[in-house]
Structures are given as structure tokens and as C-alpha cells.
């Protein structure tokens, strides 16, 4: 004991105790590598946290040096840093939002959820390491696969570049998908069932055969790939109405369809007359109306007459335009000079024709019947259906079929029809997506079509009907990413290097003023006066270089009239098209980047636009023109999806580069034409027509020849002339040709031979390998968040346990009382603790268990002088059992060698249960028990649920061979547990013995007390070793226990305790054995004080006082007697038992009464109180308890329990251990020797149903049936806790 004296005497550092909100359990937190211990209530209660971490703490508690140290962690400000930091601190403590919440509020939530627990921090770090390793592994695998793909792609590209010329497109290999045998078998079965269904429909057979009754035979699931998981439908809700169409789409798979049909068959079988099955009044039009409700182009909208007329008019206009387009293409073929192959034919916008030309259109071009299903689930299904009918089709044929479909009235019934203005323009991107050439396809994608290089046609792979659902999902995915689903070679060339603008500017596009528009139109007029040359626009302080007009290779212009266009003027030059104007507008964008609206705004400045054009028309036309421009072989624009901007790709080219590339294109075009034309013999017919044609041939040929000769020379810089105020250009006519070259074949052969040299000079560079690779979008796996710790709390209700309430009142015993209870003066508010009950059940040896309660001991600061022997009374009431009187002599303390004079105290008339025959209580934790002062413990009987009492490492809680929990206490844990002032009580069996023959008399025991006062320098724990003079004589003290009812004074501060459960059996029918002190050594029990205070309430009071008087068996002189009291609460609805401890003349009381349940109810075992005075012998007293209390409701007590041991250490035959844990009520109990939760009524029923558990029941025993040591005349019944070993299913547990 000497080694732990410092732990026993140090005050319990739990903060202030006078306010009833003391903190108890400390919790370790790991903050930035520093391990700190903080009170658990501080972390869990926001009010306490913000009371501590507040502005007042910052200003009043912290010192200047501490504040300066903490201010180092605040942000630094460039100007007035001190004032800014002060404002920041005020905002921090006032709870202001710092964009993403207040850091203090965030920290409190993290503390409350346990994110700073060392174990949580360690496992989160380990989890992060594991995730990072997994990420590195996936990255290595990805780059390994990417490297192999790069090497294979590079070899293929180099091989194709070696075989083909630089101006020709690189052919791509389209690998046909490899089908596994299972997939081929599944597709064969699908095809067979499809043919079978078609045959049945043709024959009109609706009956099911025996093979088709099974749903799985005609609705099989694909073993190779599942359509729905392979292509997840991405839901990306944005502000765009097109994207919102896929937001709430419900996907039904094959299993859902099977389940739906199965339910339908069962419903039809069991309830044929169900209202849902009566479909006689339903029509197909009603169903379509309901399905398409709210959609654009629905049937409901078609019934509107105004909408119907408008749609018919739009369809007629579209049909006219499509017919005119075909007509104009035929005309353009006869005039090679006006439209060359350098410009695609479809890029020329259709122009309205005269009505006479419509009448001349042949009837064969008008297709009245499309031959396809005009209502499809998606645009992909429509294309695959066209390919299925045509077997193989070229791109122009597919575009024509889509145009015919789009002009049909039924096309608007498709729900996806409004997603694009012109579906014919999207045929090529859709086919490239279906062929797997786009980067936006999923990883598990298999191509549906392939492109035949030899025949330049598209071919269908497999059956589209088998993959309708997958096609629909792919179509919605393609709609979201169609802007980036370009052809791979176009992407590679455009992504190779996004050029840097030649001139940086801060200009923002806005509507031009009149002067700005006039200057631009003058420059535009000069630009198109020389369309075969590059030009530089100088507007708004920066230059914009544009290339020559495509298809115009010399100054000689055509005399043909320009095509009619709805947006352009009819009197413009023929080579001024909407594509050239949009290209010029894109080139004029500031820094070469801008939105489509900005391009439209720049286009409006052109003088070639019609005067009555609206912004909507310009926006529509520009959208289509930009799509065509970025699909060209040498695209000039590219769309940046991330920034939603159009980028002009030629912004770094100079005029010389533009003209050099333009000359190369002219030479290549002439060479292709020369190769296509057959050589004709020279004719001598000099008709005007032939001369004109020869002129047309020889003129360009000579110029091309000259350009070839000049191409070998270094290019001379051309300085563009900026016109000041040029006059309007006169109509340009071709110059007259002086001589006619009759040898046309030789003239054409030279460009054909030397064109390769020109191509080599001006060929575009090989796209770098890095540009062909898409940047890998790496997604870091989300770090799993740590799980918040769960702390078991009790609500306003008390602990779930068996409740026994003693009788609220007992008649006064007729025994004489030595002295009346003295009024107790008011004492300062002291600490308190709520202790729940514990139960130990026995099966073989029925024994009682001692329960203990904490009582505040004397403070070391007060030295009380007692002048002489006083006389006090010890009164104990409401102990519902009788005890046998025993008289024992005084015995000396084993640790004291000097003889001492002591007085004899006699306990008389103890009204209560049988005194325990064998006391089994643990000794000091972590201390080796001394002989004669404590009972040795074994590991199997030492059970403490320390999880909520002390933060223990996992190694300290183990399980023994019997499956019971064992807690190993280290000296450090013991120091934490024992950090309080404690008092010691010696429990001996000498107080109790046979003596049963003395019926009707009160038991007498010897109470050894010291006769010396306690000095201020001596603490109660150091009393045995203190050297105190024994000058005062000792006297005999007779302690009488009599019933007494006394209300607690409200002015007194009181301890509010709930006692531990004391269970004893009925009297063993006179089999009382005598236990000597040699055979049964005493047990030392420690008690903790100072754990909370509540003001007392009026209730039943048990007053235990010690009266010193001179008795017959005086062993020495009388001295000062120090008395201490123990309070035993038996909480009722409105009554509380209170034990008042009077201390000599000062009469300082400590009362224990009813309390309220706390926020955290944790069991506390083995707590007993008394005071070890400075003297020869310690006080020895034994108090048995037999009360199970139910705590009353309340919220004013915060407990901080510390478990000191466990009862039932030496009980033999312990079959089932019901010990205290913090498991919630209602936990299922498991058979066997394992700890369980609180024994509630519900759990008791479960134990009884298992048939192998003992029963705890409440038995009301009349007072007359008890032993004769009870008060005479007491006929009322008292409550007793009885433990039986046999299950009694008939007797339900009562709760009072």
C-alpha cells in the first residue's frame, strides 16, 4: 500500500465539482502527430466545447506569448496584417462562414465523430496507403497497355505513310469483332426466334407452342455481355434541354421484363376480371398519347390545327429544298470552273429555284415510300435499319435516305427528333461512332458497322434488332459527346497543336458601329476582289489572316450567277458562299477563340448578307457551317468541349503559307482532273465552243506550269496593300488569250508529272504521335471515409435493469435509540456519482454479495480537534431482513505493532437480511494483496468491462479458457484509476458468527476506532503509517441501529448515488457457521469520492451515527471518537434513503439520496466507504445491501464512473456470469459462459425461453417470516431479492 500512497492521496483532477457538470473520462486525440488527452464531454457536447474554445478564453485565459504563438498559424496579409488577423479571430469565434463553413464548427464535428482518435487516424492512414498502392498498380497497368497500343499504332501509321502519298487520307483497319462460341450460339438462337416470330406473324398464328411457354426460351439473357451494364446511361443534368432528356430515364432489363410478365400471367390466372386487365376500351392511339405526353412532336400536339398547319408548311419547304439541292448538284457537274473538287458540293448551301425548274424535276428522284420504319428507338437504329435493307451503302446514299426520312411527316413522332436540327449532317459521325472510331465509345464497345476501303461503302455487322436497348443507351451517350466524336485522323490533326494566336488582343466581340462596319466592308470588298490570294483583315487593333477562297485558283472569275441562298444577296460573286463568310468570321475572332454567338455577330457585318436576315436564321446556318468546316480534311476550326469555344486552327499561318498551300491544292486538283479525263486526238475544228474550252484549259495550265516553276524558287514575301478608299470593282472578266495551244495533251501532262514535286513542297506535316493519343482521364479512387465511433448513451430513461423498490416507510423499531439524530449543518456542495446495480447469480452455493457505495471522506486540509468523548447514535432503517447477533472481541490491525487503547462499539438491532457468511470482494487493483487484509483474486473471476471506463489497448482485454472476459491492469492504468482520495474499510468475519441462539436480541460487534484526532498533514490513506500521539484515552463505543424516518433538509448538499446490486438468498434455516478471522481474512475495498453533486430532495433518510460511550468491556481510556456514516439509497418515486455522515463536533454531513439518470450510465463495482483515521486501528464495519434501485429521470447529473473491481470473486459453481457491460438493452443473450448486457425484463424472458438460465424474481416476504432480529411489532411486508437456480416459467418477473 505504501507504493500507492501518492495515488491515493492526490486529489482527483476532474475539474470543478460544485456545478454538477464535472468531466470524467479522458479521451486520447492525435492532433498533427501530438497525442493529447481531452475530456470526453468536451469533445461530445458542443456547448461545453464552445464555452471553452471561445473569444473570452482567447482574451482572458491565454497569455500574450500563447496568443503570439497561435497567431503564427493564421494567414499572413500583405498590408495591416495585425488588424486583419484580429478581424479574422473575431470572425472565427463568432461562428461566421468561411465559404465552406466555420473551422471551429468543423473541428467540433470531427472531435465528436472520433476522427482524431489514434486508432481511427492510424487506420485512415493505412487505408490511404492501400488506396494509393492500388492507384499506382492501376496506373502501371494502364500505361503498360497504352505503350503497347502506341507502338502498334505507330508501326501501322508509318507503314501506311510509306505506302500512300501525303495528301491521301490514311486508311484505317476496321477489325471485325471476334465472337466467342457462346455469343455466336446466343445470336443464332436470337435469329432463330426472330425468324420464328416473323413466320408466326405472317401466318397469323398467335398460340404458343410448348417450347415457347417457358419465358426463358424466348427471352434469353446474353451470356457474353449484358446490354444494360455494358453501356451505363450517364445522367448529366445541365442547363441544356437536350441533356435533361436523359435525367430520369428508367431502364428495364430482361429480368424486369420477365418478372413483369410473370406477374401479369399470375394476375390473369387468379383475377381474370381485374380492372387492370380490361383492355377492351383501349386503343393504340390512346397509349401513344399517354406515352408521348409532354414530348416535343407528340400526338397531342399534332391534333392542334395551328401546329399541324405549321408543320405541314415546314415539311413542304424542306422537301422543296432537298429537291433543289439534288437539282443544283447536277448543274454544278457541267461547270467545273464554278465549283471545283476542292470545295465539297454539300458545303454550298441550297438556293431556291424557280417553279419552272421544279416542274422539270424527273419523277424518279421523288421517292414516295421509304421502305423503313420511320419511328425508331434511336437514330442509330434508323441507320442500321437502312443498312440492313441496302446490305451495303455509301455515305451519300445514306445521307439521301436520312434526308428523305427527315422530310417525312412521321419523323417528328420520334422522341429524339428534336435533338438535332439536321440529322443528315450527323450521318458520318454516327457511323464512325458505331464503327468504334470515336474516342467516346465505352471500353466494352463492339462495332456494329464497318467501312469497306475498296468499295468505299458501309456494311452492317450482326443484327440491330438484337441490341435495341444497347443502341438506345449508346445513342444517348453519343448525343452528349457528339461534339468530340470526330474522325480519328481529324482529331489527331486538329489536336496535334492548338496554334498560338499571332496577335494577342483584349478585344471582346460586340455589335459593330456604323464606322466599324463600313471599314470592314471595304476590306471585305477588296478581299473578294482577289479571291485567289490570302488577305489580312485589320480591325479593332489586331490583324486576322484569312486564306484564299477554296476552289478559286486564279484571278479569272466565272461569269456564272451565284447560287440563290436565303441568307445571302443574289448579286454577290459566285465564289462568295456561306462557308467562306463563316470561315472569315472565325478567323476574325479575338485571339482565334470564341463562341458561336460571337461568330454570328462578326458575320452580321458582312455586306453579302441579305438585309432582312434574322438572328435566328444566322445562328442556324452558322451552326451547320461550323460543323462542315471542322469535318474537312484540313479543318480550320475545332470545338473545345471543356470551355465550349470554337478555336480557329489557322491563326498562326501567314499569307505566304496560305498561298503556298493553296497552290499545292490547285496543282493536285488539276492533276486529278487530268487523270480522270481521257486523252482525245487533236481536232482541227475551230468552233467557238472548242476554242472557249481550250482557252479554259490552256489558261489555267499555263499558270499552273508557271507556279510549278516558281515553286522551286524561294518564296518572295508579298506585302498586302491596304486600300485607302478604293473604288467599287468593275466586273472581272478573263483576260483575252492571244494564242491557242492546240497540243492539249502535252500541256496537261506536265502538271501531272511535276505535281508530285509541288505536293512535296507544300504537303502538311506528319501528325506527331502524341497528338493521336487522348489524354487519360485519371480518376483517383475516393478515399473511404472513416467510420464514426459509436458511443453508447442512455436517454432520459434509466438503465434497463430489474427494479426493486423497498417499502417507502417502516414502523419505528421499539429498540431504544441512544440519541436522537442531530440536525446536520449545511456543507459545501460536494461531488457525487450515480452507480448502477450489478448482479451476480449463483447456482451451487447460495451466497450474498456485498455492494458498496462511495462516500466522501475527510478533506486533508481540515484538522478537526475533538475535545472529548462524545456520544452519538448509529441509526439504520429499512433493511428488510434480520441478522443474528454476534459479539466479538477487539482485534489489532496486522499492520500496527504498537498496542493501542481502543473502545468497543456494539452494533445493535440491525434490521435487514442475513449477514453474509462469506465476503468475496476484490482488493486493491494492481496491488499485491497483503495477508490478512485482502482476498487473493484469480484471473477467471476478475471481470471488468473497461471499455467505457478507461481507454485500454486491445492487448489488455483477453478471454480465458472458460470464455470469460479478463482485463489486465497495468500500473499506468492503476494510477489513472486510483487518482483520488480514498478511504479503506476492513471487512472481517469476526463481526458475524453463530450466536443464533440469542434470538430477540440485537447483534453486537466490536467497532475498533482510534482515539486520536486527524492532523492536517496526514491524509486518510497514510493513516496506518502515520505517527500520531495517543494522549487521549480510548473508550467503548456502542453502535445501535434503529429504524428512523427523517426527511433530508433541502439546504444540505448531498451525494446522490445509486447503489450496486446486493443479492442474497433466504436464510439457510439456521445453518449459520462461525467464521473466524484466521480462516476468512478481511477484504480491503476502495471508494472514490468527489464525482458530482446535486442538491438534496426530501425523502426517507437513513442516519448512521456513531455514539462513543463507556461500556463494560473497556480496553483502555476513552478518547475522541470519529464517526463516519454510510448512506444506502433505496430510491422510490418520491422518497429517498439518505445516510448522513456526521463528523464529530463539526457534524459535517454527507447525504446520499435520489438522483437523476445521467447522460452516460456506466456500471461501477466494489465501492465502499469509510475513513481510516490516524491511529492504531482502522475502522471496521460491514453493511450488507439488498436493494435494487431504478434511477429517477433527470438531466442534471453528469457521471464519470471509475470501476474498481468486481463482486463475486470467490463464488463457486458460477455457471452463467451476468456482468455489467454497455451493450444496449434488448441484446440477444447467447447460451454459455459469456458476458451479457444488463439484465432487463425482456432479456430475462429470453433466458427463460432458452431453458438454461436462472431466474431473478421479486418476492414479497412478510416481516414475520424473517428472523427474530427484526423489530417487534413490524407486520408489514418488505421486498426481498431472491435468486433461484431453477427456471420458473409460471412466475413472470414483477417490476415495482
UniProtKB/Swiss-Prot annotation:
Renumbered to this chain, the Polar residues biased-composition regions fall at: 741-758
Q: Which GO terms describe its biological process?
A: chromatin remodeling; DNA recombination; DNA repair; positive regulation of DNA repair; positive regulation of DNA-templated transcription; positive regulation of telomere maintenance in response to DNA damage; regulation of cell cycle; regulation of chromosome organization
Phosphoserine occurs at 228, 298, 351, 1019, 1288
Q: Where is this cross-link: Glycyl lysine isopeptide (Lys-Gly) (interchain with G-Cter in SUMO2)?
A: 327, 469, 488
One annotated GO molecular function = DNA binding
Question: Where does it mainly reside?
Answer: nucleus
Region listing for Disordered, in residue ranges: 165-186, 204-232, 663-758, 1015-1036
Which residues does the UniProt record annotate as the domain DEUBAD? Answer: 39-156
Stretches for region Winged-helix like domain: 370-495
**Keyword Magnesium found:** no
Q: Tell me where the cross-link Glycyl lysine isopeptide (Lys-Gly) (interchain with G-Cter in SUMO1) is found.
A: 488
User: What domain of life?
Assistant: Eukaryota
Q: A cellular component term (GO) from this record?
A: nucleoplasm
Q: Where in the cell is it found?
A: Nucleus
Alphabetized, the UniProt keywords read: Acetylation, DNA damage, DNA recombination, DNA repair, DNA-binding, Isopeptide bond, Nucleus, Phosphoprotein, Transcription, Transcription regulation, Ubl conjugation
Compositional bias of kind Low complexity: 216-232, 700-713, 1016-1034
Q: Write down the Gene3D superfamilies for this protein, in alphabetical order.
A: NFRKB winged helix-like domain (1.10.10.2430)
Compositionally biased intervals (Pro residues): 726-737
The family database entries (PANTHER family) matched by this protein are listed as: NFRKB-RELATED, NUCLEAR FACTOR RELATED TO KAPPA-B-BINDING PROTEIN
Q: What is known of its domains?
A: NFRKB seems to be mostly disordered. The wing-helix like domain doesn't bind DNA.
Q: How does it assemble?
A: Component of the chromatin remodeling INO80 complex; specifically part of a complex module associated with the N-terminus of INO80. Interacts with UCHL5.
- What is the name of this protein? Nuclear factor related to kappa-B-binding protein
Which organism is this entry from?
Mus musculus
Amino acid at each position: 500500500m505504501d507504493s500507492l500512497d501518492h495515488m491515493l492521496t492526490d486529489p482527483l483532477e476532474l475539474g470543478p465539482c460544485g456545478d454538477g457538470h464535472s468531466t470524467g473520462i479522458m479521451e486520447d486525440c492525435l492532433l498533427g502527430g501530438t497525442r493529447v488527452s481531452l475530456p470526453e464531454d468536451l469533445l461530445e457536447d458542443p456547448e461545453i466545447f464552445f464555452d471553452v474554445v471561445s473569444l473570452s478564453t482567447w482574451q482572458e485565459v491565454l497569455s500574450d506569448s500563447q496568443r503570439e504563438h497561435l497567431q503564427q498559424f493564421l494567414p499572413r496579409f500583405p498590408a495591416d496584417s495585425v488588424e486583419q488577423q484580429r478581424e479574422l479571430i473575431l470572425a472565427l469565434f463568432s461562428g461566421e462562414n468561411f465559404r465552406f463553413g466555420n473551422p471551429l464548427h468543423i473541428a467540433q464535428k470531427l472531435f465528436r465523430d472520433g476522427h482524431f482518435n489514434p486508432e481511427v487516424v492510424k487506420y485512415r492512414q493505412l487505408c490511404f496507403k492501400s488506396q494509393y498502392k492500388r492507384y499506382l498498380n492501376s496506373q502501371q497497368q494502364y500505361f503498360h497497355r497504352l505503350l503497347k497500343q502506341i507502338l502498334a499504332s505507330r508501326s501501322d501509321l508509318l507503314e501506311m505513310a510509306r505506302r500512300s502519298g501525303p495528301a491521301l487520307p490514311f486508311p484505317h483497319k476496321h477489325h471485325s469483332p471476334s465472337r466467342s462460341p457462346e455469343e455466336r450460339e446466343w445470336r443464332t438462337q436470337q435469329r432463330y426466334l426472330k425468324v420464328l416470330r416473323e413466320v408466326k406473324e405472317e401466318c397469323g398464328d398467335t398460340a404458343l407452342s410448348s417450347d415457347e411457354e417457358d419465358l426463358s426460351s424466348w427471352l434469353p439473357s446474353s451470356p457474353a455481355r449484358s446490354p444494360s451494364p455494358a453501356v451505363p446511361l450517364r445522367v448529366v443534368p445541365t442547363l441544356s434541354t437536350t441533356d435533361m432528356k436523359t435525367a430520369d430515364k428508367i431502364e428495364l432489363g430482361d429480368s424486369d421484363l420477365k418478372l413483369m410478365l410473370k406477374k401479369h400471367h399470375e394476375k390473369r390466372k387468379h383475377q381474370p376480371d381485374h380492372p387492370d386487365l380490361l383492355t377492351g376500351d383501349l386503343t393504340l392511339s390512346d397509349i401513344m398519347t399517354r406515352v408521348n405526353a409532354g414530348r416535343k412532336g407528340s400526338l397531342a400536339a399534332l391534333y392542334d390545327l395551328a401546329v399541324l398547319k405549321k408543320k405541314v408548311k415546314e415539311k413542304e419547304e424542306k422537301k422543296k429544298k432537298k429537291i433543289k439541292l439534288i437539282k443544283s448538284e447536277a448543274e454544278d457537274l457541267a461547270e467545273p470552273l464554278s465549283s471545283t473538287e476542292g470545295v465539297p458540293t454539300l458545303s454550298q448551301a441550297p438556293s431556291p429555284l424557280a417553279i419552272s425548274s421544279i416542274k422539270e424535276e424527273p419523277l424518279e428522284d421523288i421517292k414516295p415510300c421509304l421502305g423503313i420504319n420511320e419511328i425508331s428507338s434511336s437514330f442509330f437504329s434508323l441507320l442500321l435499319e437502312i443498312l440492313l435493307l441496302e446490305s451495303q451503302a455509301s455515305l451519300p446514299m445514306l445521307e439521301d435516305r436520312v434526308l428523305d426520312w427527315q422530310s417525312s411527316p412521321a419523323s417528328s413522332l420520334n422522341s429524339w427528333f428534336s435533338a438535332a436540327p439536321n440529322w443528315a449532317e450527323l450521318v458520318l459521325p454516327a457511323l464512325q461512332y458505331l464503327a468504334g472510331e470515336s474516342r467516346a465509345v465505352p471500353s466494352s464497345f463492339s462495332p456494329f458497322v464497318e467501312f469497306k476501303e475498296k468499295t468505299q461503302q458501309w456494311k452492317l455487322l450482326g443484327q440491330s434488332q438484337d441490341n435495341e436497348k444497347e443502341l438506345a443507351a449508346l445513342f444517348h451517350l453519343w448525343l452528349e459527346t457528339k461534339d468530340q466524336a470526330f474522325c480519328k485522323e481529324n482529331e489527331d490533326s486538329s489536336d496535334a497543336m492548338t496554334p498560338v494566336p499571332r496577335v494577342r488582343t483584349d478585344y471582346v466581340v460586340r455589335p459593330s458601329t456604323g464606322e466599324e462596319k463600313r471599314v470592314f466592308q471595304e476590306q471585305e470588298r477588296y478581299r473578294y476582289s482577289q479571291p485567289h490570294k490570302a488577305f489580312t483583315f485589320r480591325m479593332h487593333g489586331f490583324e486576322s489572316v484569312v486564306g484564299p477562297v477554296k476552289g478559286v485558283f486564279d484571278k479569272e472569275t466565272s461569269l456564272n450567277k451565284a447560287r440563290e441562298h436565303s441568307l445571302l444577296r443574289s448579286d454577290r460573286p459566285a465564289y462568295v458562299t456561306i462557308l467562306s463568310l463563316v470561315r472569315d468570321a472565325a478567323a476574325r475572332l479575338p485571339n482565334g477563340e470564341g463562341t458561336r454567338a460571337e461568330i454570328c455577330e462578326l458575320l452580321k457585318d458582312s455586306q453579302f448578307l441579305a438585309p432582312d436576315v434574322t438572328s435566328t436564321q444566322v445562328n442556324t446556318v452558322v451552326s451547320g457551317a461550323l460543323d462542315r468546316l471542322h469535318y474537312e480534311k484540313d479543318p480550320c476550326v475545332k470545338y473545345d468541349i471543356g470551355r465550349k469555344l470554337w478555336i480557329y486552327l489557322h491563326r498562326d499561318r501567314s499569307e505566304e503559307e496560305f498561298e503556298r498551300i493553296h497552290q499545292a491544292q490547285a496543282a493536285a486538283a488539276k492533276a486529278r482532273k487530268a487523270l480522270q479525263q481521257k486523252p482525245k486526238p487533236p481536232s482541227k475544228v475551230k468552233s467557238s465552243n472548242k476554242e472557249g474550252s481550250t482557252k479554259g484549259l490552256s489558261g489555267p495550265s499555263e499558270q499552273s506550269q508557271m507556279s510549278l516553276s516558281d515553286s522551286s524558287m524561294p518564296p518572295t514575301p508579298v506585302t498586302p496593300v491596304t486600300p485607302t478608299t478604293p473604288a467599287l470593282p468593275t466586273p472581272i472578266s478573263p483576260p483575252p488569250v492571244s494564242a491557242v495551244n492546240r497540243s492539249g495533251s502535252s500541256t496537261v501532262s506536265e502538271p501531272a508529272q511535276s505535281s508530285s514535286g509541288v505536293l512535296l513542297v507544300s504537303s502538311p506535316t506528319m501528325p506527331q504521335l502524341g497528338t493521336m493519343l487522348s489524354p487519360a482521364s485519371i480518376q483517383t479512387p475516393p478515399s473511404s471515409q472513416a467510420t464514426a465511433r459509436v458511443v453508447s448513451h442512455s436517454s432520459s430513461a434509466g438503465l434497463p435493469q430489474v427494479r426493486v423498490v423497498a417499502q417507502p416507510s417502516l414502523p419505528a423499531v421499539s429498540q431504544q435509540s441512544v440519541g436522537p439524530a442531530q440536525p446536520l449543518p449545511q456543507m459545501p456542495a460536494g461531488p457525487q456519482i450515480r452507480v448502477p446495480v450489478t448482479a451476480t447469480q449463483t447456482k451451487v452455493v447460495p451466497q450474498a454479495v456485498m455492494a458498496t457505495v462511495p462516500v466522501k471522506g475527510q478533506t486533508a486540509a481540515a484538522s478537526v480537534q475533538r475535545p472529548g468523548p462524545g456520544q452519538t447514535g448509529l441509526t439504520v432503517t429499512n433493511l428488510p431482513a434480520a441478522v443474528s447477533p454476534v459479539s466479538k472481541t477487539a482485534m489489532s490491525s496486522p499492520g500496527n505493532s504498537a498496542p493501542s487503547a481502543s473502545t468497543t462499539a456494539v452494533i445493535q438491532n440491525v434490521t435487514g437480511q442475513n449477514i453474509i457468511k462469506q465476503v468475496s470482494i476484490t482488493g486493491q487493483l494492481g496491488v499485491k494483496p497483503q495477508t490478512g487484509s485482502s482476498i487473493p483474486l484469480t484471473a477467471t473471476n476478475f471481470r471488468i468491462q473497461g471499455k467505457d471506463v478507461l481507454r485500454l489497448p486491445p492487448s489488455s482485454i483477453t478471454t480465458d479458457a472458460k470464455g470469460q472476459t479478463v482485463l489486465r491492469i497495468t500500473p499506468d492504468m492503476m494510477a489513472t484509476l486510483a487518482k483520488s482520495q480514498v478511504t479503506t474499510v476492513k471487512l472481517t468475519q469476526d463481526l458475524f458468527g453463530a450466536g443464533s441462539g440469542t434470538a430477540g436480541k440485537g447483534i453486537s460487534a466490536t467497532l475498533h476506532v482510534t482515539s486520536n484526532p486527524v492532523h492536517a498533514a496526514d491524509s486518510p490513506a497514510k493513516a496506518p503509517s502515520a505517527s500520531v500521539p495517543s494522549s487521549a484515552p480510548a473508550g467503548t463505543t456502542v453502535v445501535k441501529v434503529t429504524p428512523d424516518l427523517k426527511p433530508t433538509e433541502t439546504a444540505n448538499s448531498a451525494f446522490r448515488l445509486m447503489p450496486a446490486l446486493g443479492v442474497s438468498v433466504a436464510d439457510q434455516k439456521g445453518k449459520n457457521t462461525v467464521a473466524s478471522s484466521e480462516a476468512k481474512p478481511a477484504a480491503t475495498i476502495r471508494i472514490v469520492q468527489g464525482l458530482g453533486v446535486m442538491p438534496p430532495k426530501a425523502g426517507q433518510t437513513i442516519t448512521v451515527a456513531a455514539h462513543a460511550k463507556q461500556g463494560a468491556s473497556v480496553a483502555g481510556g476513552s478518547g475522541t471518537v470519529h464517526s463516519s456514516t454510510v448512506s444506502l439509497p433505496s430510491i422510490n418515486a418520491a422518497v429517498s434513503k439518505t445516510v448522513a455522515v456526521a463528523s464529530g463536533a463539526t457534524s459535517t454531513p454527507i447525504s446520499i439520496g435520489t438522483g437523476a439518470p445521467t447522460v452516460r450510465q456506466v456500471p461501477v463495482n466494489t465501492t465502499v466507504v469509510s475513513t481510516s483515521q490516524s491511529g492504531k486501528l482502522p475502522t471496521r464495519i460491514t453493511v450488507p445491501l439488498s436493494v435494487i434501485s431504478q434511477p429517477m429521470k433527470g438531466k442534471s447529473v453528469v457521471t464519470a464512473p471509475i470501476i474498481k473491481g468486481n463482486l463475486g470473486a470467490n463464488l463457486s459453481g458460477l455457471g452463467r456470469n451476468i456482468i455489467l457491460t454497455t451493450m444496449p438493452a434488448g441484446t440477444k443473450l447467447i447460451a454459455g459462459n459469456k458476458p451479457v448486457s444488463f439484465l432487463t425484463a425482456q432479456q430475462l424472458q429470453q433466458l427463460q425461453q432458452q431453458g438454461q438460465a436462472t431466474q431473478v424474481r421479486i418476492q414479497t416476504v412478510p416481516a414475520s417470516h424473517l428472523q427474530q432480529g427484526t423489530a417487534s411489532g413490524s407486520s408489514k411486508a418488505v421486498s426481498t431479492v431472491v435468486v433461484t437456480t431453477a427456471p420458473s416459467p409460471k412466475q413472470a418477473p414483477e417490476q415495482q
